[in-house]
């Protein structure tokens, strides 16, 4: 019985973390979570898919997808800017059925467009993209955002303290 008690004692947050980053340094890395967590990755995948869809709609050679109205663009931008934990959880629910993370984003986005009667655009979600395309771009945007909004300002602050 004492062994079980000791095992439970050692199963604390820090000892069940994947690395020291989310364990003993979790307080120092808290600001990175919205960008580099799984939530952040899902959010950035959504952003990549939407920006690609907007780019396709702006291409006059793709006549099957009309240019988005201001109202539709506003809705798409809202999906990016107001992406929430609830949205990420909905995508994770879809992923449980599809067993495919990027496909789950695609299905979630299709549903969001269907709700706004943007059915023509539905056919062009993920058009000519691979999952690797979406992931590579999402990770690149995450790195850029993390560097510009957290890492570089932190380095500048430390540098000014050392002067």
Locate each region found by the language model.
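N-terminal amphipathic/basic-hydrophobic helices that include classical n-h-c signal peptides
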Residues: 1-10
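A helix-coil-helix interface module used to build multimeric assemblies
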Residues: 9-163
